[in-house]
């Protein structure tokens, strides 16, 4: 985005309307000047509201942060921190749909429907001709506190006590990414809202035996980890697959917004008596049987990328609208499925899985699989069981059993690594390679998240899959892309 207040346009100087709009939005929240004295400055009072005063603002967990707390191995989640922030969701509300070109945001889309006119009356093209379509995620900080018997997950605009992890501002593709083929024959990623009758963009695994209208306008799948990286590199060094911290940041925002780890909780648009969000994003595209999905379109993505624009979801979340699969069932009848949307991000979970860029997983023993982050400049293909300690950072242990997640490993940061599993579901499903407790397969693996159209109640943003090696690929796996803005 151009951050200059004054810019050159057609040889003339003019004010940058995007900066003015951002300033105007911020000024709406300033307190009035009643009772203000000379020398007063803007502070945050004990209630977490902006006010004029002489005292310097000192951010604390009570006035400048909000989050959730739960007893370890239990589901008794409560909201903590600034209650006003829980009602107003200041960080979540800064996620905005936008059209961007490389690292510059060209304009923000209409928050009530991306295909609707902008403030200047322009109806934005969403087909990529004016730039890619994505969701801008703001800079913020997050941390996990271990009190001994409880965990606390916090987010804030401040690194309050020096223990918070900074989340850099970034743009995420508004759904798993598409690709397009250049004149030189190379395939590159791009993010747009494409209708299923657009013959220019064939998605999925591009299987010629599948009816084209069931692949057109869909995310790209059928490629392995290295090929996904290649398609990003073909576009430029400014765009990559989503990394683990970026993914966990969006998870945290959703978990705190609904005070629940169950993304699939039923949609409930009513607020609680305290004015808080409740429920979840609904089941998502998770109700397809594998064999029927295979017959329908070869396990390729179900929902076209234009769907959220068509349904005027804008910067909002799941609204209850369905997607209809014609002639899906064996008797020729149709099937309805309900895409999960979080803050404009289509299929935040469900439909197809997403690859994560920088994570390496290797079996440790019968009880755990070790989870690592690649060090800067290290490629996934360079990792072996012998050099993993030198080329990676250890960040936690994944439970070596297939079951629902009951607790996470937060020892090394705000990463939602499933450390304990069982039938008392807290969050989604943990899926490993092979049978429970296997300790002979030491292959280097990649991380998948979210679950697919066949995963039912196991799906969700926390559905953690470590069963793929780097060379694996499938029609049911794609990936989000992100652009780091600093």
Residue ranges of model-derived segments:
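Short, intrinsically disordered N-terminal pre-domain segments
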Residues: 1-20, 486
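Residues within well-ordered beta-strands of beta-sheet-rich folds
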Residues: 136-138, 171-173, 344-349, 480-484
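Short aromatic-cysteine micro-motif
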Residues: 124, 128-131, 156-348
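N-terminal module-boundary/linker segments of secreted carbohydrate-active enzymes
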Residues: 57-163
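A short, polar/charged loop-to-alpha-helix boundary motif
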Residues: 362-376
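C-terminal, surface-exposed recognition/capping segments
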Residues: 248, 270-309, 325, 348-360, ...
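Extracellular repetitive beta-rich solenoid segments
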Residues: 24-57
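Acidic glycine-/aspartate-rich tracts in secreted/extracellular proteins
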Residues: 44-49, 140-142, 177-178, 246, ...
